[in-house]
């Protein structure tokens, strides 16, 4: 006895076009994948000689997964106003919700972000990188702050929106959500 089996025609190309893969679902992305990225810039010039923390760049992100890590990359070009001795600190803070980062948790600190003795430049930090694990899907706000530690005379630390008039930002903060392992 012979048994014959017939199957309907199957066209792989048609089946693939039926799938909606314009974007890979976040849940299917492997650990350590970048889920989202946000960029923020200094949009006006800032001059400070304050020993209190002064906000330079602020940005927000809402993680999709509570297990995600948040990578904060900061690229800044601080200048020292006039030629007096100047030492300034930089820090990155995190707050939960919009408008909360200025007094939030410190996650990165650099005591000598900018240091000048007299008219000689001694040190300048152009980049700060921090990895945060906030364990939430609420809006997070990150802020880069600067404060003057010591100064002689009237030195200021300065950040420009466009220092040389070339139409390109000079100070930028990039915030990325990185998929966690769970």
Where are these regions (language model features)?
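Secreted extracellular polysaccharide-interacting domains
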Residues: 53-55
């Amino acid at each position: 006895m012979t048994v014959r089996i017939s199957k309907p025609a199957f066209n792989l190309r048609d089946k693939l076009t039926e799938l909606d893969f314009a974007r890979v679902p976040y849940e299917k992305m492997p650990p350590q994948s970048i889920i989202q990225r946000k960029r923020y810039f200094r949009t006006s010039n800032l001059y400070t000689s304050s020993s209190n923390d002064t906000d330079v760049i602020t940005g927000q992100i809402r993680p999709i997964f509570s297990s995600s890590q948040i990578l904060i990359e900061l690229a800044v070009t601080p200048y020292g106003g006039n030629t007096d001795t100047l030492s300034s600190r930089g820090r990155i803070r995190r707050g939960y919700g919009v408008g909360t980062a200025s007094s939030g948790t410190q996650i990165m600190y650099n005591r000598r972000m900018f240091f000048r003795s007299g008219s000689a430049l001694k040190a300048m930090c152009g980049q700060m990188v921090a990895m945060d694990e906030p364990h939430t899907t609420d809006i997070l706000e990150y802020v880069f702050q600067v404060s003057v530690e010591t100064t002689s005379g009237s030195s200021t630390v300065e950040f420009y929106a466009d220092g040389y008039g070339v139409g390109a930002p000079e100070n930028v903060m990039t915030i990325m959500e990185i998929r966690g392992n769970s």
